[in-house]
Amino acid sequence: MSQEFAHLSVLLAETVGGLNIKDDGIYIDGTFGRGGHSRQVLQQLGENGRLIAIDRDPQAIEAAKQFADDPRFQIVHGGFGQLADYVEELGLVGKIDGVLLDLGVSSPQLDDAERGFSFMRDGPLDMRMDNSQGQTAAQWLARAEIEDMAWVFKTYGEEKNARHIARCIAADRDKTPFLRTKDLADLIARITKSKERNKHPATRVFQAIRIYINSELDQIDQALEGAVNVLAPQGRLSVISFHSLEDRIVKRFIRRHSQGESVPHGFPVTEDQINKSRKLRAVGKAIMPSDEEIERNARARSSVLRIAERLDY
């Protein structure tokens, strides 16, 4: 594999292991990236197995050519939030044995200054997962209202100085538009101070803008609901999160579908009916990376893996 596509997949063995790969199973890698998890799945699949990979990043689609000669593999260019639609088009609803989701931005995207995801590298303020469509971060910052910016920074970045930063951006953009990542990062560093050790003051704002531009949390909601609807009985769901917003969504989703429908006290419903409304069971506890993995790959530090299994009622 070329250096361009080199990428250390986080919690690789644990995530793929959580899928309980069957020789002839059908699996979905909803976030192909550079193919680390897909490669591991293909290595464990038999000749009659099948892997459907999904990604909206054109560079990821290019990277998928490494598996072009493998008849068990196919790549879909699109967002993982629409995975249920893709599965329906393929006539595989209820036949999927496992879904893997590695959420957030990938290392190659962060490391490529031209993608505009990182405040550590100067590049165009883009931040689109699919840079062939949609508005860029620069375009949004140029016309967003102060209240809207503050809401995004607070909601998606949990930024305590959200309103102050939004006001400063609005004041400065009238003089010079924010077109480069360095422009935005320098402004935030100048007007705020991060109280979190070893964390750049712009970290939360960059995260918030990226999540908003790409509708990431909506994509997660849609993907999780879609996964439950396409999984076969005993099919597995493995999801890696990288920050509290993502993990909260995944944790609550698994809990909600593990407990079944909530009914008012005294409502005439049988235990069997409640059981039939349960769609998932959590498999073990949340898995964190080992100290050894964090030492090899610092970006694994904040990762959390949760695994669930589709129930058969």
UniProtKB/Swiss-Prot annotation:
Chief location category: cytoplasm
Positions that bind S-adenosyl-L-methionine: G35, G36, H37, D55, F80, D102, Q109
Catalyses which reaction(s): cytidine(1402) in 16S rRNA + S-adenosyl-L-methionine = N(4)-methylcytidine(1402) in 16S rRNA + S-adenosyl-L-homocysteine + H(+)
EC number: 2.1.1.199
GO biological process, one term: rRNA base methylation
Subcellular location: Cytoplasm
Any Pfam family: Methyltransf_5
Keyword set, alphabetical order: Cytoplasm, Methyltransferase, rRNA processing, S-adenosyl-L-methionine, Transferase
UniProt xrefs under InterPro entries: RsmH, SAM-dep_MeTrfase_MraW_recog, SAM-dependent_MTases_sf
Gene3D superfamilies recorded: Putative methyltransferase TM0872, insert domain, Vaccinia Virus protein VP39
An example Gene Ontology CC term for this record: cytoplasm
GO molecular function, one term: rRNA (cytosine-N4-)-methyltransferase activity
SUPFAM superfamilies listed in its UniProt record: Putative methyltransferase TM0872, insert domain, S-adenosyl-L-methionine-dependent methyltransferases
Superkingdom of the organism of origin: Bacteria
Transferase listed as a keyword: yes
Similarity remark: Belongs to the methyltransferase superfamily. RsmH family.
Function: Specifically methylates the N4 position of cytidine in position 1402 (C1402) of 16S rRNA.
Protein name: Ribosomal RNA small subunit methyltransferase H
Species annotation: Shewanella baltica (strain OS155 / ATCC BAA-1091)
Lineage: Bacteria, Pseudomonadati, Pseudomonadota, Gammaproteobacteria, Alteromonadales
